[in-house]
Amino acid sequence: MSTTGPLDATLIRDVAVATATKASYDMSDTLYSYLPKVDQFYIPEWLTMQFIANNLISFTPLFSYGTTIISIEKCKTALGFSIDICATMLIASILRISYYLITPYEITLLRQSLVMIFIQLILLRTSLKYRPDEYKYQNLTDVESLSHLIHDIWFEFFSCINRPKFLSEDWKNLIKSLSFTNLLKFSFKIFLAFFYKILKFFDPNFKRIGAFWQWDDDKNFWRFLALFATVQILVTFFISNILNWDSLAQGLGSIIGSLGLLVESLLPLPQIAILYKLKSVQGFKLILLVSWLCGDTLKITYLIFGAKNISALFVIFALFQMSLDFYIGGQYIYYRYYYPKLRHQHHPNDSNSPSDEDESEMYELDLFNTLQKDVEKALKQDSNDTSDSPQDDQVGKSQAQAVTL
């Protein structure tokens, strides 16, 4: 019977440890041969900064506008948010997709357009679902007609409304007023009138021609988008890919691309008008403004340093849009922090001066009072027209009293 001494046991243990260590080294060497070693960490070859930047640009709209959708659903009202933002981004994205059919550009920007259309359709549906009565067409303000503006400007410079008689005093005064300086001022005023009409078109507080994007029937929004997208893409595809009319396709592509960039750069204008009208930031989320500014910064950086085959117009319009976003930032700071203090200084004895959170309620109350006065005026007019019928007159007075109560 053989026995194992302490020395033999120690030797056996050392041999076992050495064998296990060698086996683990062989296993690790085999594993490392399949996995590249980069600074002690495994990083896939496809996970580059370019890949991260491309996906940030493509999917940023999901976060920026997704938070707005959640906010509207939570508050059950779209007051303070302009649905014109949906129109701007949807039209611009459709134009960019049709432009891609003529002049292919970075696939990242095309992917962003598709994602933008998806999230804007959801945002439009949510905004229409909780659209307040203030945004309905019949409750908006009428804007002066262009002919009326031109008539006033003509009378201001030439002091003559109708055509003067030949060799009359008015005719002589009209000839004297036709100086170069006067004509230059008149032309400048006409330009300002056209510019004023354009700005009012982007102001959602005023009525537009044909009630564009101010329809009371929600189905009209979807009909317009379906018709616009179908006609735009089919015409572009037919000219560029079926007819192969290169000269016409290039000219059409330049128009579509420039128009799409212009429409997208005007995105902040409706929101600027809404904030100016309400004199409050109620309903407008700071996260949306931050996402706009971050998106503009990321887009400009990408266009300058990372993109290929990009026209300088992309950068110019992106800078213009960013300047409007900074203007909204100034509005937010003013109406959030300074305007309440200035209002309190003008009304120091008013201890019940409303806060920023009550601005939208005040606006709704003022609008209701205005509508109430219009109803009372209409009822009084009807009562005067039917004064020969005492019974009808009494009914009109009762209705007016009911509205007042």
Curated annotation (Swiss-Prot):
The keyword Metal-binding does not apply. GO terms for biological process: phospholipid translocation; retrograde transport, endosome to Golgi. Residues 379-405 are annotated as: Disordered. Residues 396-405 have a biased composition (Polar residues). It comes from the Eukaryota. Gene3D superfamilies: 1.20.1280.290. Residues 73-76, 125-177, 245-254, 307-312 are lumenal. The chain crosses the membrane at residues 52-72, 77-97, 104-124, 178-198, 224-244, 255-275, 284-306, 313-335. Phospholipid scramblase that transports phosphatidylserine (PS) and phosphatidylethalonamine (PE) bidirectionally from one leaflet to the other of the phospholipid bilayer to at least partially collapse the membrane asymmetry established by NEO1 and other flippases. The PS scramblase activity has been disputed. Functions in the trafficking pathway from endosomes to the trans-Golgi network (TGN). Present with 937 molecules/cell in log phase SD medium. Interacts with NEO1. This is Scramblase ANY1. The gene is ANY1.
